[in-house]
């Protein structure tokens, strides 16, 4: 049974919607799957603000129902809540995720090798733009970890498309992140690759960043160093880009305290309400 006391009173437990599977094509003809959440009281005559959601990993896959992993169970619940609050939400299973075959998982030039999965971000945005029920001036994006990376990429490279974003413990410079899973990595010894890795990072495009962002991070994160958000905030400050920060002291990557998940999602909703409505 559900631990009812852990469910926020505002969560629409009695009016969950069934998301729809959506398949769209990236510019290089790769098919991308997603789950589309329409508002609870959907009206075909209205135009809604819309959000893209990107999972972490990247070796993950979002589902058409609650997830078996707690991190993504929470994210699915948040997408349900956003739909209940009159947002159209598209959760994107971008390339390098699992469940669509080896070629999809080991996608050419993904991640630090060229960020080819960014094509899926743009394809998802174009799908939303093609819908008559979406307000093209109010498209945002959010995600955690690898999804935070793609959120930051969207804002850095295409603030002309994305009006706002929420970046939860996202990676912003591949040359920093690689050291987490390959401690011997030395960018100075691999200059060509290091240049490619940097150019596959949000920090490489921060000069183009215009749209507001909320940065959420625990300061004891061992997966994505807290310094990633600190360094991005400093770069945004120099660019006079509006940003907010929510920092959880002594919190790790996958938040240990349920109340911190709730607080982060409350802040996410509040930020989008102020910046996109």
Name each model-derived stretch.
Residues 1-277:
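Serine-hydrolase catalytic core recognition
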């Amino acid at each position: 049974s559900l631990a009812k006391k852990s469910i926020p009173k505002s969560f629409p437990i009695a009016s969950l919607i069934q998301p729809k599977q959506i398949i769209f094509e990236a510019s290089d003809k790769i098919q991308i799957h997603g789950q589309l959440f329409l508002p609870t009281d959907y009206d075909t005559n209205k135009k809604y603000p819309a959000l893209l959601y990107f999972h972490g990993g990247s070796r993950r896959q979002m589902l058409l129902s609650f997830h078996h992993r707690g991190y993504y169970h929470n994210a699915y619940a948040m997408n349900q809540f956003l739909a209940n609050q009159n947002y159209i939400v598209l959760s994107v299973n971008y390339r390098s995720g699992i469940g669509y075959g080896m070629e999809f998982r080991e996608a050419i030039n993904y991640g630090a090798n060229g960020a080819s999965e960014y094509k899926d971000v743009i394809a998802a945005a174009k799908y939303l733009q093609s819908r008559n029920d979406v307000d093209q001036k109010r498209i945002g994006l959010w995600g955690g970890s690898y999804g935070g990376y793609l959120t930051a990429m969207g804002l850095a490279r295409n603030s002309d498309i994305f009006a706002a974003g929420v970046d939860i413990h996202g990676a912003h410079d591949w040359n920093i992140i690689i050291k987490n899973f390959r401690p011997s990595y030395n960018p100075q010894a691999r200059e060509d690759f290091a240049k490619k890795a940097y150019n596959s990072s949000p920090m490489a495009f921060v000069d183009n960043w215009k749209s507001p962002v909320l940065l959420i991070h625990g300061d004891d994160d061992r997966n994505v160093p807290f310094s990633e958000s600190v360094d991005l905030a400093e770069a945004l400050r120099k660019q006079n880009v509006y940003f907010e920060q929510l920092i959880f002291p002594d919190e790790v990557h996958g938040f240990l305290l349920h109340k911190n998940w709730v607080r982060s999602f409350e802040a996410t909703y509040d930020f989008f309400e102020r910046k996109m409505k």
